[in-house]
Amino acid sequence: MLLLAECRDNGPRQFRLTLLLVGVLVTNVVHIPVAAQSQAILIRAGEIHTVTNGVITDGEILVRDGLIQQIGTSVDAPADAQEYQAEMVIPGMIDAHAHLGLDRSSRSRIPGPFTPEWKAVENLHLEDPMIQVALSGGVTSVIARSGSGIISSGQSVALKMKSTPGPSMILKPYVDLKMAVRPLINLRPGETPQTVMGWYATADDYFRQAKLYLAQKEAYTEGRASEPPEINERLEALLPVIRGDVMVHAHSHYPSEIMMVLRLARKYGFIERLALAHAEEVFPLIDLLSGTSIIPVIGPMMIVQYYNDPEPINLLKELLDAGITASIQTDMSNQHFKDFREYGAFLARHGLTDQQALEVMTINGAKAMMLDDRVGSIEVGKDADLVLLDGHFLDLTADRVERVFIDGQLEYERGEPEQGDRLRDVGPFSPLRNGIGPNDESFAITGAHVFTISDGAIEDATIIVEAGRFTRVEAGGTVPAGIPVMEAGGRVIMPGTIIARAFANDWIGDLKWQVQNDEITEPIVPEMNALYAVDPWFPSYRVNTTVGVTAINVTPGTLNLIGGNGVVVKTPGLDFEEMVRQEPSSMVMSLTSGTTSYWAGASGISVTLESASAMIRDELDEAVEYSRGDPDREYDQRHEAMLPVLRQEVPVLIHANRVAEIREAISIARDYGLRLVITGAVEAHKLADEIAAADAGVILGNSGSFASDIRGGGDGWSSKGPAILSQAGVKVAFFGPGASRRASPIGRLGGEPILNSVWAFRNGVPEIEALRMATMNPAEMLDIGNRVGSIEVGKDADFVVLEGHPFDYRVVPSHVFVDGRLEVERR
C-alpha cells in the first residue's frame, strides 16, 4: 500500500512518500492503476522504432488503459480513438543513474560506512523542476539514487516522469542497492574504510550477517526454530538482493575494483543481477563480462584514452560489440540535461550504430532496473511510454521531441520550436581526388564549400596555403603550377574550433592532478601561470585535434579570487612552449559562491561577495600604485603579473554566475578600466543589455567536465541564454574540457565545441552566430582574431574538411590542418 503525504519543511511544498508494508515486500513493483480512458489513443508515424522488433514504416500504435494494445501497419482502432501524428516514435528514454528528486545525501546525512536501510523513496522531492526538464527531453523513467560517500548509501527508486507529482511516479520503490567503491577513499576518515581492502572486508561481513539472518528467518518460518531472529532493519535491506528481487548498482572504476565487486557478487549470489556504475576502465575485462548478464552503466565519461593508445576507446561500442548489455547515465542532481537523446547522438558520432544508440537509451536501461518487461521498448502489453518526434531521434539541429506519453497519458507537449531556421544546404559530394601530405608546406584545395565565418560561404572555392597561412581564398580561381592539389568534391571547409577556456588538468579519476588547477595556499595569486600546470603529452591534446579543435585557452581554475595567467596554445605537439601562441592570454578571477565558500571554510571566517570584491580591489589598487612607481622600483612578481591586465593588453576573465556576482564583475572592470569577459555566467541572460553596454564577452560554463556544466543548468539557467545574449550584441563562447592522462576531451558530452554550437543553434541562435561561438568569438575575446577563427587571407591555416554540415551528428572531420600542416586524415 502506498500513501502520499504532504508536508512543509520551512520551504517549498514537497511531496514525501512513505511505504507501508501490508503483506507484501517493499521490493514489489508498485502498480498504480491508470484511470480507464474513455477514448483509445491511435498514434500514426512514418517510422516506429520498436527497439526490440525492428522499424515499422508507416505504422500505427493503439494505446488503451495505459498499455500498448496493438502495433503494426494497420491496427484495429475504434472510430472515436484520439489520433496523433509523428514523423518518428521511439520508446521513452531511461536514465539509469541520476540524483534528481533527491540531494546527494550519503555525503552528509546518511551515516557510514554501510547503510542499506536508507530509502530514496522516503526522501523524494517530486516537485524538483529538473523532473520536468528531463520529461521535456523524452526521458520517461529514471533511477534516482543517493550519492557515493559510503560503501552502501541505500535503496534507489525507479521513477516515471510525470507533469503532475504523485504516487503514480513510483515505478519501483526499491529498484537496486546503491554501493560505491572508489568514491569513498579519502572521504570521512575514521568513519569509512580508507582502502579497497577495508571496503571488501566491511561489505563482506554485512552480507555474511545478512545470509545468516535469512537462514534464521527461514528456519523459524519452516518450523525448525522456535524463535525468529530479532528484526534488524539493516540486514532486512540486504535480503531482496540475496533473494534476487533487486539489482546491486556498484560504483567501480578500475579493473581491480570491478573484480572485487564481482567476487562479492559471486559469493553472495547476485552476480546475475549486477550493474557496474561509471566503469570507465572496464575495457580490459570485456572478455570476462561477455556472456554474463552484468550490465555496465557507463557515464558521464563514455570515451577514454591513455598515452600511446592509438585511438580513443568508446566504451559503449566495445561493450555492445562484445554482446554485453550496457546502458548510460547522466549522474545529474540539481541539474538535468534536457537533451538526453544527445548522449545517443554523441555515441553514434563516435562509433555506435543508430540502433545501438537507441538501445543504450531505452531497453538496456530497463534491463538495469529489471523492468524490461514493462518499459524500454514498444511491444504489446508494455507500458505506453512513448516519445513522438518531428525528425530523427538523433538529429541535434532542432528540439525534435513533440510529445511524450507516459502510461498512455500525454504528459508533455512542445510549443513552437526555438529555432525556425533551416541550415544551409551542403553537398552532394563527389570523391576526393589527389591528396596532401603532412610534409607539404604549400598546397591548394579546389571545389570546396568554404564557411569563412567572417564573410559568408563560398561555393566551388579554391584555397591556397603557403608557409602555414592562407594566401588565397576565392570562388573558382586558378592554382599555381607545381603545388599539390586536393579536389574537395564539394566538401565543407571551416576554421578549426577554439576552446575559449579550459583548465590545465581534468581531475576526473586522478588524485594527483585534481590539485593542479588552483594554487590554494592563499586566495590572491596572480603570479601563477597555467603554462606550468600542463603536461602536453596527455593524449587529450591529440584527441582535441582529431575533432577539429586547433587552439585552446588554458587557464588556472576558479577557486582563487585571483588565480593567474592563461595561455593560448595550438593543440598539436609535445613541446608546450612551441605550442604557445599567446602568453599571457588572460588573467582569471572569481566571485562565485563556490569560491567564497571555499575560502570561508579554509580561513574559518566569513567570506562574502563584498569581501571577495574588496580583496580583489585591494590587489588592483596596489598594482596600479606599483605601475606608477619608479622604473627602478623593487621587482614584485605579483604586481608585475597584473600589469598586462591594467594596460588592457589582455582581458580579465571573471568567473561569476549570479546576477549580483556579474554586476560586481562589471563594476570592477569599469572602475579599473579592464577588458572584461564573464565566465560561468549562469544568469548572464538576465543582464544581457548591461553586459552588452559594458562591452563584455561571455564564456558559458563552470568547467569542461560535463555538458550541463558547460551549458548551464539548475536554478537561474536558461537554454535560451546564448540567443538572448547574442541578440543583445554580446559575444558568446564556451568552456571546454581540460587535459587529462585518461579522460578524453570527447569522453563526456559537451567536450566538442561544435556540439555546443549546435545546442545554441537549436535553442534559437542563428546558424552563422552559433558557428562563431566556436571559432571567431573566442578568438576575438582573446585578441587572436587577427590570426585564427576564420578563413581569411593572411591568417593561420587552421581548418577542417567535413563531408556534411558541421551540425550533423554523423559528421566528424576527415582532415584537420593546423598552421597549414596536415595533422589528421581519416580514410
What are these regions (language model features)?
Residues 1-15:
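N-terminal secretory signal peptides that target proteins for export/translocation
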Residues 18-29:
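Bacterial N-terminal signal peptides
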Residues 135-273, 400-401, 406, 413-414, ...:
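Polyanionic/metal-chelating signatures
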Residues 46-49, 379-422, 780, 792-827:
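C-terminal cap of metal-dependent C-N hydrolases
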Residues 48, 52-90, 454-496:
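Histidine-rich, glycine-flanked metal-binding segment
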Residues 46, 61, 66, 86, ...:
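Divalent metal-coordination and catalytic microenvironments
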Residues 105-106, 114-118, 247, 298-302, ...:
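His/Asp/Glu-enriched, well-ordered alpha-helical/loop segment
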